A protein has these predicted regions:
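Helix-to-loop junction immediately C-terminal to a conserved catalytic motif
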Residues: 49
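The feature captures the beta-strand-to-loop junction immediately N-terminal to the Walker
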Residues: 34-36
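Short beta-strand immediately N-terminal to the Walker A/P-loop
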Residues: 31-32, 86
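Conserved ABC transporter NBD signature motif
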Residues: 59-69, 116
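ABC-type ATPase nucleotide-binding domains, specifically the catalytic core motifs of the NBD
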Residues: 12-13, 31, 52-55, 97-116, ...
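Conserved structural motif at the start of ABC-family nucleotide-binding domains
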Residues: 2-4, 18
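Conserved ABC ATPase signature
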Residues: 135-139, 143
Length: 151
């Protein structure tokens, strides 16, 4: 279960962005976060995925945990290992590169782990394995989204 309790985020030590945000998401559930512009959706997601830094004072209060384990101070790469990820609206792939080249340009992974991670992605999305050498720009929209998630 993902649990966010009493999250507070302040930018530049003066701008209160979020206050008292609390919710729980049962394991295995897929959710979307809806709200008006400027309501803090992206800030909540960035907090959960480790892209806001508690050390720099961005997250000033609250706890984010997965299955009871506090991840508030964890790096994004450790949070991904817990099964927490963000799917961006834009696909953010390089159309002129192959599927494999796009996956190699992935995230915060050491170079020795890249082959293993690529294999994991291709196991998750077998359709990409069949198209791994082709240019990403020729993938369908759904396949491009799978590639973006894999990256």
């Amino acid at each position: 279960m993902l649990s966010v309790q009493n999250l507070e985020v302040v930018y530049q030590d003066v701008i209160l962005v979020l206050r008292g945000v609390s919710f729980e998401i049962p394991k295995g559930k897929i959710v979307s976060l809806l709200g008006s512009n400027g309501s803090g959706k992206t800030t909540v997601i960035r907090s959960i995925t480790g892209l806001l830094d508690i050390q720099n004072g961005d997250i000033t209060k609250g706890t984010i945990s997965v299955d009871g384990e506090d991840i508030t101070n964890e790096k994004p790469s450790k949070i991904v290992e817990k099964g927490i990820a963000q799917v961006l609206e834009g696909r953010r792939i390089f159309a002129e590169l192959s599927v494999l080249e796009n996956l190699r340009l992935g995230g915060h992974t050491s170079s020795k782990d890249i082959p293993q991670n690529i294999d994991r992605v291709l196991d998750l999305f077998p359709i990409l394995k069949d198209r791994s050498k082709g240019e990403a720009g020729y993938l369908s929209g759904g396949e491009q989204q799978m590639l973006a998630i894999g990256r």
